[in-house]
Amino acid sequence: MPKRQQVGKSGVTPCKHYLLDKILGSEFGVTSRPQFDNLSAYIVIDLTAGDGVPVTRDGELIPVFNEGCSPGICLKHLDHRAKRHPDKPAVWIAIEKQPETFQQLWKNVSSHLEQLGGWHGTDQRIYEAPVPEWNSQKEGCKLILLNMNSHEFLLHKPLTQLNLDSECAVFLYNDPNHIEDWCLSEQLVRSLPRLTTSLSTLGCNVGGMKRLEIGKRRQWFDRVDMIAGTLQEWHDACLFSIGGPDQWAYLITAPTKWRGRISESCRKAAKQVVGRKADASITWLKENQGDFKDHQRKLFLTKQELASNDY
């Protein structure tokens, strides 16, 4: 069975989607305020877009596109921006590397655009062939679907082609199935503008991660530490986990002054988990580095390794 189906059936997916929805809602709202009029655009980059097939939430007869998948959630906020703040440019870039999955993504997104109305396809390309690409526009908002490997993505290309300067704000969504799918390279992170925030999935024990040898699991430490080491001085990193045997966890980077807001969203997100009671564990790096490191160790190490104090 594909891993994405396992994840969806675990009941954790609604938690992830709730958190993404709340963070995007806040960021689209904040970047539409007058103090951000100098931004060339607010850019949302989904590095692991998938097929755009929504997951059915508990109690629903049919899945809801704008709540049940990351492309639907991103597009919901982008369309709202186009309607409410057409003078505030925004861009959504969705990247999917598998050709068949990309075709399904394109079909699902284009079908929903027809329902929303007002979106028009454009001929403006970011990449030259052979990279498959599909673009659409509504007022000052654009969406770009790219069939490529996110490991090869850098922001300067879209900025150049869209005539945007580097004075923009960026949100990154990174939802890997396993460590090899992690898309936030240090090269990408260091190339991003100073107003960049992110939400990443940390698979932790899904599929028996703690049965992997320690060298493999150390890569999760390396990924989190790399993100923590590139934080702006006014930003912080949050580890949010929801307990249980699968130990799903998320890494969030955001302005320090948003700690309270994001922590509350995390607690509410944990309540969205289906099939079990989920207890939210939340630690902020700059608030308490010791607790943050302990949180990492509990997520990535076995009980025996924790007891040995060798790691």
Predicted regions, residues:
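Short catalytic/ligand-binding loop motif for oxyanion handling, primarily in non-cytosolic enzymes
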Residues: 53-56, 101-104, 154, 180-182, ...
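Acidic, divalent-metal-binding catalytic cores of TOPRIM
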Residues: 133, 137-138, 152-163, 224-227, ...
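Rossmann-like AdoMet/SAM-dependent catalytic core
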Residues: 219-311
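Basic, amphipathic N-terminal segments that precede the first structured/catalytic domain
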Residues: 1-18
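Flexible, glycine- and charge-enriched loops at secondary-structure boundaries
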Residues: 13, 64-67, 217
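Active-site segment flanking the S-adenosylmethionine/decSAM binding pocket
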Residues: 143-214
